[in-house]
């Protein structure tokens, strides 16, 4: 508060050390005051900052770098698709000497488990549109194409899309025919389900309709269509005798079967 009040007061009159030379001294002071002020203008310096940790955006970066000097503009590079930070940005300081000091101090500085990379960009390499839109706040992308694609489509929308596709396909076929290209392909028309014939569509399936009656003529017609099985059984049945458990029984059974075969041969003779 005291500094502000003192600055508002007019500057005190300068006095010469020798009172006799005060008149000549005041003339020289007025001449110096009338001279045009040729103060040195500060040239801004642009600083590249890379390997930024997550969660460090424009407000945090500006508040951090303002401890070195006045920050004119700042920009964090973001993705147009997701809106997230790409991990690098640009800071413009009022004085290029301050930018050099910041680059020497912050280069290879560990911040948020990442090593920050900083270097000063030469003025001739700074693009004129580097900081365009840096003052305006970041706006999240709206994704109009994604919302339009994911919305629920009505039957009218599906019909409109189908008609557009068919019209494009017909124009393509005409262009191919005009160029003399004989090329046939199913196209979108094959994917659209065909409409039923009006005769089939008008057939009523109501339960109130009259059901057909089983008349004798209908029953006879059904009987004639049936295939009757043959009464004669031509199947061949082979009977196999069970084998006896003991070996003696096996020999006896073999002898009996041999005798039976001989008897059959004699009868046949």
From Swiss-Prot:
Keywords: Developmental protein, Nucleus, RNA-binding. Residues 246-269 have a biased composition (Acidic residues). Residues 234-269 are annotated as: Disordered. It holds the Pfam family hNIFK_binding. Disruption phenotype: Embryos have various defects including smaller heads and eyes. Residues 45-123 form the RRM domain. The keyword ATP-binding does not apply. InterPro entries: NIFK_FHA_Ki67-binding, Nucleotide-bd_a/b_plait_sf, RBD_domain_sf, RRM_dom. GO terms for cellular component: nucleolus. Its main location: nucleus. It is found in: Nucleus, Nucleolus. Plays an essential role in early embryonic development. This is MKI67 FHA domain-interacting nucleolar phosphoprotein. It comes from Danio rerio (Zebrafish).
